[in-house]
Regions:
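N-terminal export signals
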Residues: 1, 7-27
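Extended terminal and domain-junction accessory segments
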Residues: 11, 26-39, 143-175, 250-390, ...
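C-terminal segment of N-terminal export signals and the immediately downstream linker at the start
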Residues: 23-56
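N-terminal edge beta-strand
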Residues: 54-70, 197-207, 350-375
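Extracytoplasmic beta-sandwich strand-turn segments characteristic of Greek-key/jelly-roll folds
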Residues: 64, 69, 95-127, 204-205, ...
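Hydrophobic or amphipathic alpha-helical targeting/insertion segments
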Residues: 125-154
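Acidic-aromatic/histidine active-site loop/patch
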Residues: 164-215, 222-225, 354
């Protein structure tokens, strides 16, 4: 057991949860429990993803899965980042409502971090929950080859579960010998995206974890895949949805099946069954069931009269619908090829937002925003997908309150940073534009983003 793992065991005990995360927590650079200072690198590495074979990957701190960053709601976290890749990169803190200068989007919020350079990210997360971090440059390659990790923001007042497990879902573009296949094939980019063929949870294919009989278990599920939407189901216990995209819901409900698009997260909770029984986490495809991972329950002295502890709500600004301004966003398909760049490479454009394909940006060229919003005002985004493929629509720096899905008004609106639009789907998502800056707004199917389905909004 390495030092970082020992440190996390101590920290987990102090927080009242079992140290059950799949990867060691990132080692803090300070021994003070109320300070969160970390060192993080992006670098080439080797990983055993397909058993018996080694794969060249890109890893945070050379690790697959990446180390989990843990911090606390309302307390400052500092991450000293160094780029050891052979190309520029940045880190985006997905789902966190933090200042624009820390958002990790090249040219829009910071200069690219060049090979060999370092950059310090420093922010105070206002929300607790399950979030993740990834580059926002050459995303098809950098995310596809492994630069994805979790950042878990603990509640300001600790919420005590007996056990906690984090599950990062990803399909890798590998053959049977662990060698890379194409990360992006244009004919698939124009449809659902290019799917990987080797499915993993925390870098392992169909892993098994142990849980204690009668334990209250919190499972933090994160879809860090470039392409695939996972319809999630749990067998063997009654599981309850307690948070969506890091945001607790007021009234937990029993899980039957829940779709998690790329970039999205789902927190579920359950009581571990009797020793010897198993809990199965499944990916559902119609009538077909695909295993993701399983939990084996072991003997324990834990009492059997447990209940799921409630989560406090995050401090999301209440929307003022009576004075909200509505803005329509239509996501559609239109195949085209942009002019070749200086290297002679032609980049396809397949997707449009309000008739515009993302044209890219540089230090000398920032396109016009998709919309200009007034600071402090409530907006309703009317989202409409007029294509045959799913689009998880993600807004940086803000949290949506979803009011309507596919024409149906929700009795209980929920908070999220990513709205999954299905085939010909629609949604009404409201939010208060309370975070000034220029914020990326895009589909989180990475190839869709790469081939046009991206832009930004400006809040001022």
């Amino acid at each position: 057991m390495d030092l970082s793992r020992r440190h996390f065991l101590k920290l987990g005990s102090a927080l009242g949860v079992s140290a059950a995360l799949p990867a060691c927590s990132l080692l803090k650079l300070t021994s003070k429990e109320d300070e969160y200072v970390y060192q993080l690198t992006a670098e080439p590495a080797q990983a055993s993803l397909v058993p018996g074979y080694s794969t060249s990957v890109l890893g945070f701190n050379g690790s697959i899965p990446a180390p989990t960053i843990r911090c606390r709601q309302g307390q400052k976290v500092t991450i000293h980042f160094t780029n050891k890749l052979d190309e520029p990169t940045t880190i985006h803190w997905h789902g966190l409502r933090i200042p624009i200068a820390m958002d990790g989007v090249p040219f829009l919020s910071q200069p690219p971090i060049m090979p060999g350079e370092s950059f310090t990210y420093e922010f105070t997360p206002p929300d607790a929950g399950t979030f993740w971090y990834h580059p926002h440059m050459n995303s098809v390659k950098q995310l596809g080859m492994g630069l994805v990790g979790l950042i878990i923001v603990e509640e300001a007042e600790p919420v005590v579960f007996d056990e906690e497990h984090a599950l990062m879902l990803k399909h890798w573009h590998l053959d049977k010998k662990g060698q890379w296949k194409d990360l992006m094939i244009p004919r698939y980019s124009a449809r659902m995206g290019t799917p990987g063929e080797w499915g993993t949870v925390n870098g392992k294919h169909n892993p098994q974890y142990t849980i204690k009989q009668n334990a209250t278990v919190r499972a933090r599920i994160a879809n860090v895949d470039n392409t695939i939407t996972y319809p999630i189901a749990v067998e063997g216990v009654d599981a309850w949805v307690i948070a969506i995209d890091g945001n607790p819901i007021e009234t937990p409900y029993q899980l039957t099946q829940h779709k998690i698009g790329p970039g999205m997260r789902l927190d579920i909770a359950f009581i571990a069954p009797k020793a010897g029984d198993k809990v199965y986490v499944r990916q559902m495809k119609g009538k077909f069931v695909f295993p993701l991972c399983e939990f084996l329950s072991e003997e324990s002295w834990l009492a059997s009269d447990k209940s799921i502890p409630p989560l406090p709500l995050n401090p999301i600004a209440p929307v003022k619908l009576y004075q909200a301004q509505e803005i329509d966003f239509v996501f559609e398909w239109e195949g085209a090829v942009t002019p070749a760049d200086k290297s002679g490479h032609a980049v396809p454009n397949f997707w449009l937002v309000n008739k515009r394909a993302w044209e890219g940006m540089s230090a000398g060229h920032i396109p016009e925003p998709l919309a200009k919003l007034e600071l402090g005002k409530t907006y309703i985004f009317n989202l409409r997908n007029v294509t045959q493929y799913h689009h998880p629509i993600h807004l940086h720096g803000h949290t949506f309150t979803v009011l309507e899905l596919d024409g149906k008004t929700l009795e209980k609106p929920f908070h999220t940073d990513t709205v999954l639009l299905g085939k010909n789907g629609s949604a009404k998502a409201a939010f208060v534009a309370d975070n000034p800056g220029r914020w990326m707004y895009h589909c989180h199917v990475i190839e869709h983003m790469k081939t046009g389905l991206m832009g930004f909004i400006e809040v001022a």
